[in-house]
Swiss-Prot record:
This is UDP-glycosyltransferase 88A1. GO terms for molecular function: quercetin 3'-O-glucosyltransferase activity; quercetin 3-O-glucosyltransferase activity; quercetin 4'-O-glucosyltransferase activity; quercetin 7-O-glucosyltransferase activity. Keywords: Glycosyltransferase, Transferase. Signal peptide: none annotated. CDD domains: GT1_Gtf-like (cd03784).
Length: 462
């Protein structure tokens, strides 16, 4: 048989892809003799956001090969009934199964495939992996607490017949603090949601895998990890995180990155609040204005990544017309506003940054932890409200941005939280402790290194 290989199958969004690539790099660092093959389904939106990244990885890591599948057009691509991106994503992945099967067949003929690792969203591929002999693992790109929820969701469904999660006052999940039903992942809040039953099925399928790899570490989510193995009775979990991108600046954004970092060089230590909300984090024009007013009133130094509102997403971003009149000139001594993108990891690791206003995407949380930067939690979509409860109430490395019932955040609230996170905030010390714990987990005797070693040994020829 040919060269030994590991096949990775990420979900298309950039955050999922980056996490899976980091997993591939980590596997290679421990076993360079392996080759990594990543199967790519074209993303249904913003395909340009992944193209340059993929090119960069390909040129830097010759042992990582990307296999691009043809684009598919799902039935719901033009549907107005879809109210979150998960439904489109799941349909595209399901429609891609025939192409995935052909790719796996080809890889199996040319390589000795030791294992396949799939994203949680790619569960539909289990329908075809039974045709092959290699073991299949899940890679869960959110935290262990969210994984515990996914395991327990079928039980919640059975024990609360007819009830929508959003209407349940308190939900109890093993290893997770009690939280409001409305804080559960958005896709499962209502039973008549088009993907609700799919997520129930996902929860039931988890235990059918050979194991689950989680991008977390024991000290960060010890209670949730323990609950999965003991209360939910699934022992083959491998918390091998934190897996985050390094601080290297992507070539396409060199000028913008250098500009951000040069500006930070001129700021006092731990004086700057960094506001960044991910590739899908969009605000209405009214909310953008409210953020601007709050930042100006706070008097704090800030670096703010601004994207176009949804209604203007396809137009050129004009900061002067989007922001309050005169805002840029009035705040130029204390603030910097950048369009669409900033080098998040280098920014978070800069000594001038003292706080991070984040959408609570799991990658961003881990990046902040590894940089020792406390967070202001402002969730926007997917499982981010769930993550907020975890980092505010359980792990205590963030404070919460409070919103109205409609999700709107006032300028006064922005002002208060920005001032609080830069001041003598109690979560700062806790965040630094977690930074140290993350570093320890990756050492030779650390929990994550041990979990990864155990996983790799299971793939070795018997």
């Amino acid at each position: 048989m040919g060269e030994e290989a590991i096949v990775l199958y990420p979900a298309p969004p950039i955050g999922h892809l980056v996490s899976m690539v980091e997993l591939g790099k980590t596997i290679l660092s421990k076993n360079p003799s392996l080759s990594i093959h990543i199967i790519l389904v074209p993303p249904p939106y913003q395909p340009e956001s992944t193209a340059t990244y993929i090119s960069s990885v390909s040129s830097s890591f010759p042992s990582i090969t990307f296999h691009h599948l043809p684009a598919v057009t799902p039935y719901s691509s033009s549907s107005t009934s879809r109210h979150h991106h998960e439904s489109l994503l799941l349909e595209i992945l399901c429609f891609s199964n025939p192409s995935v099967h052909r790719t796996l067949f080809s890889l199996s003929r040319n390589f000795n495939v030791r294992a396949m690792i799939i994203d949680f969203f790619c569960t539909a591929v289990l329908d075809i992996t039974a045709d092959f002999t290699f073991p299949v693992y899940f890679f869960y790109t959110s935290g262990a607490a969210c994984l515990a929820f996914s395991f327990y969701l079928p039980t919640i469904d059975e024990t609360t017949p007819g009830k929508n999660l959003k209407d349940i006052p308190t939900v109890h999940i093993p290893g997770v603090p009690p939280m409001k039903g409305s804080d559960m992942p958005k896709a499962v809040l209502e039973r008549d949601d088009e993907v609700y039953d799919v997520f129930i099925m996902f929860g039931k399928q988890l235990s059918k895998s050979s194991g689950i790899i989680i991008n977390t570490f024991d000290a960060l989510e010890n209670r949730a990890i323990k609950a999965i193995t003991e209360e939910l009775c699934f022992r083959n979990i491998y918390p091998i995180g934190p897996l985050i991108v390094n601080g290297r600046i992507e070539d396409r954004n060199d000028n913008k990155a250098v500009s951000c970092l040069n500006w930070l060089d001129s700021q006092p230590e731990k004086s700057v609040v960094f506001l960044c909300f991910g590739s899908l984090g969009l605000f209405s024009k009214e909310q953008v204005i409210e953020i601007a007013v709050g930042l100006e009133k706070s008097g704090q130094r800030f670096l703010w990544v601004v994207r176009n509102p949804p209604e203007l997403e396809k137009t050129e971003l004009d900061l002067k017309s989007l922001l309050p009149e005169g805002f840029l000139s009035r705040t130029e001594d204390k603030g910097m506003v950048v369009k669409s993108w900033a080098p998040q990891v280098p920014v978070l690791n800069h000594k001038a940054v003292g706080g991070f206003v984040t959408h609570c995407g799991w990658n961003s949380i881990l990046e902040a932890v590894c940089a020792g930067v406390p967070m202001v939690a402002w969730p926007l979509y997917a499982e981010q409200r769930f993550n907020r409860v975890m980092i505010v109430d359980e792990i205590k490395i963030a404070i919460s941005m409070n919103e109205s019932e409609t999700g709107f955040v006032s300028s006064t609230e922005v002002e208060k939280r920005v001032q609080e996170i830069i001041g003598e905030c109690p979560v700062r010390e806790r965040t630094m402790a977690m930074k140290n714990a993350a570093e320890l987990a990756l050492t030779e005797t650390g929990s994550s290194h041990t979990a990864l070693t155990t996983l790799l040994q299971s793939w070795s020829p018997k």
